[in-house]
Regions:
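Active-site catalytic motif of lipid deacylating hydrolases and related acyltransferases
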Residues: 61-149, 282-300, 304, 311-321
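Flexible, membrane-associating and regulatory peripheral segments of lipid-active enzymes
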Residues: 17-87, 91
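Loop/turn elements at helix/coil->beta-strand transitions in domains of secreted/extracellular proteins
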Residues: 53-55, 100-104, 148-151, 178-182
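Surface cap/lid and interfacial helix-loop subdomains adjacent to catalytic sites
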Residues: 131-148, 170-316, 320-321
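Gly/Ala-rich beta-loop-alpha elbow adjacent to hydrolase catalytic centers
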Residues: 156-160, 164
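Short, hydrophobic alpha-helix immediately C-terminal to the catalytic nucleophile
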Residues: 165-169
Length: 321
């Protein structure tokens, strides 16, 4: 997903949040897709083993409003169709990757249509600001009522990573809350290595207090199609460092839509700010040939790798306290 974060960030603060519409009340439980005392059954069954109860995970889901024919700039959080889609897709297949690393919180928010990124001056900016202001309000409510000083993992994908990057800049970067940052997982967007003033790109698997990011593409795809990633921050979500290559046997597993885990499925190769992967080895690999890139799978493709790494970082953070 291509856009200028610097521009978006500047526009956000120049706007003075003047474009925000009616605020969402996050004291209402139904305005949360996930809280630790209200995990949907479809999500609960994805959790494997024990959970770190001294760490929280604040998760923000990716863009689901993709239909070019849909005229809406934002989704109302009471839209039953999208609520069900959120619960049964990104909550189930993405957020679950962090379920063992801490207590999960995920707000419903009025996310922006995908067109917002390419039309900042023609409605896109206001659309993204509405979405971010919801995420921001939910995060403030979370801090004031739920967190109680625990470590914090920020996790998201695509548009979710957009909003989390702004939370990092507004609430963590050089602020007191930075001491509670376990890690920020913000894949699916292009970030600079120096995107934040005091929050580093983490290049060790047990490192804490920083961020990790990546964008996944097909290995045989014409690399010119991903040229906008050139020079962007990237780590290998199999090795959790900047190693340029990881063989299939190091891949811990990706979660497919049939809820099955496929291990040792592909090689990963870092080049020009992108994680290039070989065609996954699994029973439905023919589906991969129809895809131009694997953006939609930035989390699912590395689900078990993320799960294990998030547990490791939570453990490392708690040992340092």
């Amino acid at each position: 997903m291509k856009h200028s974060f610097l521009l978006l960030f500047v526009l956000f603060f120049l706007s003075g949040r003047s474009q925000q519409s009616l605020k969402i009340d996050y004291s209402i439980p139904s305005n949360w897709a996930l809280t630790p005392d209200n995990y949907p059954a479809s999500f609960q069954k994805m959790i494997k083993g024990s959970v770190h109860d001294s760490v929280d995970v604040f998760y923000v889901y990716p863009t689901l409003l993709l239909d070019k024919e849909n005229p809406r700039w934002n989704i109302d959080i009471d839209d039953s169709v999208f609520r069900e889609k959120i619960i049964n897709s990104p909550i189930k297949f993405q957020a679950s990757a962090w379920a063992n690393a801490g207590k999960l919180y995920a707000p419903f928010y009025r996310q922006a249509h995908i067109r917002a990124y390419s039309n900042l001056e023609n409605g896109g900016r206001d659309s993204l600001l509405v979405a971010y202001n919801d995420v921001r309000a939910a995060f403030i409510y979370y801090l004031e009522h739920f967190n109680k000083g625990r470590g914090i993992i920020l996790a998201g994908h695509s548009q979710g990573s957009t909003h989390l990057s702004l939370l990092l800049k507004e609430f963590f970067d050089g602020k007191e809350l930075q001491k509670q940052l376990v890690a920020a997982y913000i894949p699916g967007i292009g970030f600079e290595r120096n995107e934040f003033q005091t929050i580093p790109l983490m290049i060790q698997k047990d490192q804490t207090g920083g961020f990790v990011t990546w964008n996944t593409h097909k290995k045989k795809l014409d690399q010119r199609t991903a040229k906008w990633h050139l020079g962007k921050a990237v780590i290998n979500p199999v090795t959790w460092d900047t190693a340029s290559y990881a063989a299939r046997q190091f891949h811990q597993g990706f979660l497919f839509s049939n809820e099955k885990m496929y291990v040792h499925s592909f090689n990963t190769h870092l080049k020009n700010g992108v994680v290039w992967i070989s065609t996954p080895h699994f029973p439905y690999r023919y589906l991969a040939f129809t895809m131009d890139n694997y953006h939609v799978g930035d989390v699912n493709l590395f689900w078990e790798d993320i799960r294990q790494n998030a547990i490791l970082r939570s453990t490392s953070y708690l040992q340092k306290k």
